[in-house]
Amino acid sequence: MRVCFVSLCFYIFSRKTSSKVSSRDAFEKRLSELGNRGDAREADDEDNLSHSAAPKRKSAHNPAPTRACFEESMRSNSSTDFFDAFFHKALADVDEFQGFNVSKATLASIASRSGGKIGLYALQKHAIDDGKFGWNHVAGASEFWSTRDFHTYIREHVNEIAKNLPEDFKEAYFLINNYDEPQSMGVHCVDIDRLRKLHPNVGEGIVSPGDQAPVWSMSKVRGCHMDILFPFPDYFSHLRERKRSRDTPASPWSERPNDDIAFRGSTTGFGDATSNLRARALSALIDEPGFDVGLTVPIQGFQKSWAPHLFKNTMKAEDFRKFKFLMDIDGNAHSFNRQLLIAQSKAVMVRVNVFTDWIADGVMDEEFCYTIDPSDVLRSARAVRRTLLDDLERAEHVANAYHRLTRWLLRDEIVVRYLRDAFTRYVSSVRFVE
């Protein structure tokens, strides 16, 4: 952990001493999605990640996944330390179930009564002792578009993912949530009413703490939900595209003419003009100098007549490429696809998030992105914009680092390692009973 420890010391020092506030056609098509759609619901260096080391548990010392740590990991051709720091929160979520007795009957009942929201799957070692494994549907929804790629990927890589399981392992059961929203509110979520005011899609879910039933989901509100996180569908789409082509073309950041922070997108998410997170955020910024924001398509029951002044024409890919700063705002849950498209465009990501996902926690504020507080949008947005304009050189470094970080994430070695560590921790933590 030496690399990230040194980087952490540098990060703390720099924070204390700094005065700053905290193939082309395919690219054109995908970048256009920033303004035409809502969420997906509709690094070149090689590293030598250890595939044999057991996943690490919580420790008192958790280095931060800083830009310096990432760059040093790439230079040293070993990203294990950065991997551990980047995914610390997501993997530590699994440890919350340490010592749980998990009823297989309860898991099957939850899946069966979920109305298609949840499927129960089993990771099973072959009966014949060939050292191979299977990923099999047990109950509930067996097929759903949002998790289809996830299940396909697990089946294709199951032996790599399961290679660190104990010698006597036979089977383990996984509740897989097909929906964007989490399904398992924790016992310590005492402020859900406040969270709902920030984002109406925040809910309790269909699994209660008393069920003692871990749920694997694509998104959650940290501190409120117990869901364990797995990759969202757009990740696999970008992973396939990454394998087919090299880096996508984009105009140099410093040559982009527009310093406004831009957003175009649908009204994805619950709520009306005052409660829908996107509408609420844009209402605060629509007349603010330095922001070029607008809604494009009213969906999910939202009426354009509720806030006609928020609607603007969509932007094409070439329009987005003129901006140095692009905004990401949660949709039904975390805005999965947009964060990857922003990275692909090599713009600075300015995010307004209530939810998180399996990678978002590792994307540190002011290291790889900038963050607007969803509870105080206007004041926070003004502060972020001042920070960006006060140090454009740093902003460019942040944009470039986030682009390289995302390319590092879009690799089989990374997602297989994450799933291997998460599955191994899960099997170690829980005991399945009849």
Residue ranges and their predicted role:
Residues 36, 291, 346-347:
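Short aromatic/hydrophobic-glycine micro-motifs
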Residues 315-432:
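Catalytic binding pocket for nucleotide-activated donors in carbohydrate/polymer assembly enzymes
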